[in-house]
Amino acid sequence: MLSPKRTKYRKQQRGRMKGKATRGNRINFGEYGLVALEPAWITARQIEASRRAMARYVRRGGQIWIRIFPDKPVTQRPAETRMGSGKGNPEYWVCVVKPGRILFEMGGVPEATAREAMRLAAQKLPIKVKFVTKANFEEPEPVQKAAPETTEVAASAI
């Protein structure tokens, strides 16, 4: 299963999943993709189950790219432990996914095959997803920061 080789810190805070994905929201490698429609934590086990389902369906044909990586540790306390005495130990790894994020890409297979493989992968995931192709995929607009409004000071006011 996927997990980082080493991290700077063993434990992380939970954080929030606000807004849409600004990175990883374009199809870069294959011809077809699976886009997240909801925010969620996706575990390393779910990613691996999805990958196996796709690989088993396409067999030797085509290529699969996993566009997400579980880099966030989730801690759990041991069973029947009293409150206090610090944070629990890291038990598994998750990937924070926001709406619009490309989860998987596929290439080198017909669209019908890719669509069915992605459908099987989607059943292993805890969120709603959408199948997209490079041809019909609308590019997300780049976020432009508004320029600060400058108010001109009248010369007589100085």
Curated annotation (Swiss-Prot):
Region listing for Disordered, in residue ranges: 1-22
GO MF annotation list: rRNA binding; structural constituent of ribosome; tRNA binding
Pfam families reported in the protein's UniProt record: Ribosomal_L16
InterPro entries (alphabetical): Ribosomal_uL16 (IPR047873), Ribosomal_uL16_bact-type (IPR000114), Ribosomal_uL16_CS (IPR020798), Ribosomal_uL16_dom (IPR016180), Ribosomal_uL16_sf (IPR036920)
Keyword hit for Phosphoprotein: no
Domain of life: Bacteria
GO BP terms, alphabetized: translation
Cellular component terms per the entry's GO annotation: cytosolic large ribosomal subunit
Keywords annotated in UniProt: Ribonucleoprotein, Ribosomal protein, RNA-binding, rRNA-binding, tRNA-binding
Record function comment: Binds 23S rRNA and is also seen to make contacts with the A and possibly P site tRNAs.
The protein's assembly and partners: Part of the 50S ribosomal subunit.
Family, per entry: Belongs to the universal ribosomal protein uL16 family.
Protein name: Large ribosomal subunit protein uL16
Organism in which the protein naturally occurs: Synechococcus sp. (strain JA-3-3Ab) (Cyanobacteria bacterium Yellowstone A-Prime)
